[in-house]
Design a protein with these regions (language model features):
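Solvent-exposed coil/turn segments that connect beta secondary-structure elements
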Residues: 49-51, 72-74, 80-84, 93, ...
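Extracytoplasmic beta-sandwich strand-turn segments characteristic of Greek-key/jelly-roll folds
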Residues: 1-11, 67, 90-114
């Protein structure tokens, strides 16, 4: 096998290593951004139960089925449930977090456009799961 060159294999291995390093660095960066909750974020408790959502603001104000927030302000959701497992989802803002009894899961977001956006349960939670919806209302 004299004259056989390994250069194509080494180039292939080098390209794969560079791509894996890039994907790993991007994944680490995204994880770091997701975990960094802004210091001024308002905490909103989100409680799922068959078959509606309850929202409790830091000042004690409660809303059922509708959540009113301000545009360009950060919010941290503390999500739990009173009964079976649910999954809190605001599709337009890529918010998706499980609601598990006895546990508080956190996720944050900062709405950047005003309007009304659907809130849904993304975990089958019983007979009326399809009707477990709410509305996020982002105000100027």
């Amino acid at each position: 096998m004299s004259g056989h060159s390994n250069w194509p294999e080494w180039i292939y291995v080098g390209v794969v290593i560079v791509l894996l390093a890039y994907v790993g660095a991007e994944a680490w960066n995204v994880e770091r951004l997701v975990d960094h909750v802004p210091a001024d974020a308002e905490v909103i408790k989100v409680i799922g139960q068959q078959w509606f959502w309850t929202f409790e603001h830091a000042d004690g104000t409660k809303e059922v089925g509708e959540l009113h927030v301000k545009k360009n302000h950060a919010y941290k959701f503390e999500i739990t449930t009173k009964d079976v497992n649910h999954a809190f989802n605001i599709h337009d803002y890529v918010v998706l977090q499980d609601a598990v009894a006895g546990r508080i899961n956190e996720v944050w977001f900062a709405p950047d456009k005003a309007g009304e956006f659907p809130i849904q349960c993304r975990e089958y939670c019983g007979l009326l799961h399809y009707n477990m919806r709410g509305t996020l209302i982002v105000e100027e």
